[in-house]
Structures are given as structure tokens and as C-alpha cells.
Amino acid sequence: MPAVNGTLYECSDRKMWLKLYCCSIYDFKPEVESRFDAVWDSGAFQASNKTDRKMYADIIHSVLKKDGKVFMAIEEFIQKDCGTLDTEVIGNNFGEMFTMKTTEFVEANEEYRKKFKINGSHVYVMSKN
């Protein structure tokens, strides 16, 4: 199996099968690992360059199994022009490959809001079509 430049953490409990890859998503290919049940994205898509977002979505799609899920948190900044993404941007990139559902908005506590200038996080669940 090809390697990816990064670190792999694996759960040692035989009752649970969990792998956590810490690497660049753009280096990750289905030849490294595929058929994931789920991917947790906490800001990676939002932080990616606009020109790379479609490639990001394509890579995620390629490594998920048929009914795989993406759990995505998108930060809502106090100043809207500082990188807040709306559902249209997500939909334009994940398009027909996924069915998207907005689950909730998690409001930031006052300390987090002041320190990072963030109102909270929009949480999305996307199912692979």
C-alpha cells in the first residue's frame, strides 16, 4: 500500500476500528486508504484555497464508501467577509456527489467569541450519493 507523508494514529482496542490520518488531504489518494465510513472536517474545507475546493471534495468522495458521511463544521466569523462560507459554496463544490443537511448552529461561548472573532459553527452532515 502506498504511503502518505504524515502520521497515522490507530486505535489499539479491537472492539473499535478507528484510524486518524494527519496529513495533507491533497496527498491522500484512494490507493492509500479507501472505503471510509466517515470523514470529520473541522475547518479544512473552509481553510482551503477557493481554487482547490472542488479537488478537496473529489478526494473526499473518492475515499468514502458508498453510504459514507462527511461531518463538517464551518465557522461563522463576526465579520462575514473574513472567510465564512454559506451552504451555496459548499453545495457548489460537493454538488451532486453528496446530499447535504444542515444540522445545527453551535454558538461560541463569550471567551471564544472575543478571542477568535467567531459567532459559532454551522454543522453539516453530507451523505455520499
Predicted feature locations:
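Class I (Rossmann-like) S-adenosyl-L-methionine-dependent methyltransferase catalytic domain
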Residues: 1-18, 22-32, 57-59, 63-129
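Hydrophobic beta-strand segment of the Class I
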Residues: 39-40
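A short, conserved alpha-helix within the catalytic core of class I
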Residues: 47-59
